[in-house]
Amino acid sequence: MAERQVNMELSNDLKNLPASGDETKIVQEVYQFIVIRLGDENFGIDINYIDNILRMQQITRVPKVPAYLKGVINLRGEVIPVMSLRIKMGLSDDEIGRDTRIIILKIGEEGNVGILVDEVREVIKLTDSQIESTVGDNVSPESRRFVSAVGQNGEQLISILDLTTINLDDN
């Protein structure tokens, strides 16, 4: 009797499965990015790399370093180098304003590094289908080597930064 009931339940379960050839829903991975502004361009930074976002504060200059390395800050007892992402990417000099922020990134063995950005705009979610791995004409030539992909957020294009290219080395 119990065997017959199990067979009936299995039969009912099988009836609910999609038939061969039926469309099945494909689950896409969702990624979160913080959208920043540098000049007239919008860039996305994977939220997993972000440790902190700070208002602009005093940066202590360090002598004999590349121009893009603005100096260091002290964050809860940790000395963190701060670089100008604009200068590193070959864009115009920084324009420090009330929206300027220092984003503390967690980058591999280098530890934490701060980057100056003109503005932190928003947090967005993008799926695989919204991210194009080829970088087109929407990214300035100076920025291309720092961009790994382009995301489509509604009508807005977001250049996704490749954080492996944003290091403290002089290249």
Question: How would you name each of these model-derived features?
Answer:
Residues 1-171:
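An acidic, low-aromatic, low-complexity terminal/linker signal
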